[in-house]
Amino acid sequence: MNEKRRKIVKFISAELSSICARLGDVEDEEQECVDNTPENLQDTERYTHAEECVEILSDARAEIETVIENLEGV
């Protein structure tokens, strides 16, 4: 791979890192919401959806981190 394409890949990797950090911020905020939900509301659909969102965000971040690691080998 030539230098120009390597720079593009490095730029994309940096952008993915930024996206991953932003997703982490959203995940942390949603987790805080889940953690602070009163016990009497923990059996609601909204609470369950919030828990699912935290898991989805966590999984997405893990996938992005894997992509970033793979790009480091380029």
Please place each PLM-identified region on the residue numbering:
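Long, low-complexity or tandemly repetitive, helically biased scaffold regions used
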Residues: 1-74
